[in-house]
Structure formats: C-alpha cells, structure tokens
C-alpha cells in the first residue's frame, strides 16, 4: 500500500514540476520528502525481499575476509568491516542505502531538469531501491558517473565503473 502512496506522491510532484512553474518549491519538497521516505524504508525494512535471509546469514557469519565466494570484493569488505565494527545488520543496510541514495540523488540533480519525474522513473523501475540489491548500488554509481562523461573526465568515469 505504501508503494502506491509513494507513486501517487511522485506522480503529483511530477505534474507540478512540469506544468506549474509557480510550484517549483513544492516539487522540490516532494522530491526530498520522497527521497527521504525511500531511504528510510530501504534500511528499516526487516525480513523483506526474496534474498534477505541469504544476505543476513552471510553478514552474521562473516568472520574473516574470504574473497572466494560469489560476492563482489567491495561488498565482502564492507560486510566484514561493518560486522567487525558494529555487528549490526541494520547499520550495514543504512550504509548501503546511504551509498545508493547519495549517488542517485546527485545523479538526478545533475542530469535532470525534472528531478521528481526522474525519481518517479527510478522508483517505477526499481521500486525506489527499497528492496535494494548490489546491482542498484552499482546502477546508482554508474548513473552518477555519467557526469564524468559529460565533463570529459574519462579516468574518473573509468574509476567509477571499476568501483561500481
């Protein structure tokens, strides 16, 4: 139900953004409000998503840096560090969500003249990244890295692609 409400909020914000130039401030409020709601939902969720238990079990049982499994090295390293420092899966979800939404919001603000509409498109394709997986983080970094192509900073773009 809440996904429908978020969709309606984004849809209304998109109409304001495109068709009512006097309400640009309202559209910005809707953009940041929706982004904040999606961010909160993405790391406060518990036992949601088809592969939640697999990720949770991996996090709970990581005691050394073993790069021989099917996860990316950066993801393994991040899991290990968060497990070692905080031993809290919620902290891991918070950090993953922060990475994802930082890069998504920066990319949308840089690339789009209609940020609410862009967030609506992102939400429609990924359910807002609420049930995020590693590929959404990579997608967010890649979307952000498009700015380096525009600015002709090829080495920064390649670095971002490698990180993603």
Language-model features and meaning:
Residues 1-38:
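Start-transfer (signal-anchor) and selected internal transmembrane alpha helices
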Residues 24-25, 104-123:
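Transmembrane-helix signature of polytopic, membrane-embedded enzymes
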Residues 28-34, 43-66:
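Extracytoplasmic loop-helix module adjacent to an early transmembrane segment
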Residues 53-87:
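Short hydrophobic/aromatic helix or loop-helix immediately within or flanking a transmembrane segment
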Residues 73, 85-102:
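Loop-to-helix entry region of an early transmembrane alpha helix in multi-pass inner-membrane enzymes
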Residues 115-143:
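Membrane-embedded helix bundles of polyisoprenyl
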Residues 125, 155-164:
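Membrane-interface alpha helices of multi-pass inner-membrane proteins
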Residues 142-156:
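Membrane-interface transmembrane helices that cradle and orient dolichyl/undecaprenyl
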